Amino acid sequence: MEKFTIYTGTTVPLMNDNIDTDQILPKQFLKLIDKKGFGKYLMYSWRYKDNKYTEDPDFVFNRPEYRKATILITGDNFGAGSSREHAAWALADYGFKVVIAGSFGDIHYNNELNNGMLPIVQPIEVRRKLEQLKPTDEVTVDLEQQKIISPVGEFTFEIDGEWKHKLLNGLDDIGITMQYEDLITEYEKHRPSYWQ
């Protein structure tokens, strides 16, 4: 996993509440098992007319000025619903690095973190300010300082210390285990032969 320390990008507002994992990535695309390639299916039912890959020009992701946005500003209860990790894969593959919401579905929140993204909880007052940013306005997210720095103000956010450590150091669960490789190897040397 890549380290996440300070990230600067532009935002796209999608302020709907209760965007569930089936809206983020519909069930018909869950057959794939590689993390890559899901971005084209992100918000499929909203991005495309008649579900035929004809872009709906009214959907915010399809507007030219928002196509390169990497920070999503959204509503409450983002990622509720089924526990499909594919939804986080789709967000990451599309290019999102940060999702700022009023709240998250618990499993989806962890799935975003496990995939190197930073989900941030902010109250509606902050999200309404961020929603007003121009498509070219840059926002910096400083994980170490736990700050969002934008043209409309600076805002602090909370994150669990263990997740913060993992992101700052680019560690997933396997990476953390590998930090103890020497100790594990030494322990295995002293195990009874019937366990080896």
Swiss-Prot record:
GO terms for cellular component: 3-isopropylmalate dehydratase complex. It catalyses: (2R,3S)-3-isopropylmalate = (2S)-2-isopropylmalate. The keyword Lyase applies. Pathway: Amino-acid biosynthesis; L-leucine biosynthesis; L-leucine from 3-methyl-2-oxobutanoate: step 2/4. It comes from the Bacteria. GO terms for molecular function: 3-isopropylmalate dehydratase activity. Pfam families: Aconitase_C. Its EC number is 4.2.1.33. It is an enzyme of class 4 (lyase). Keywords: Amino-acid biosynthesis, Branched-chain amino acid biosynthesis, Leucine biosynthesis, Lyase. GO terms for biological process: L-leucine biosynthetic process. Heterodimer of LeuC and LeuD. Catalyzes the isomerization between 2-isopropylmalate and 3-isopropylmalate, via the formation of 2-isopropylmaleate. Belongs to the LeuD family. LeuD type 1 subfamily. NCBIfam families: leuD, PRK01641.1. HAMAP family: LeuD_type1. This is 3-isopropylmalate dehydratase small subunit.
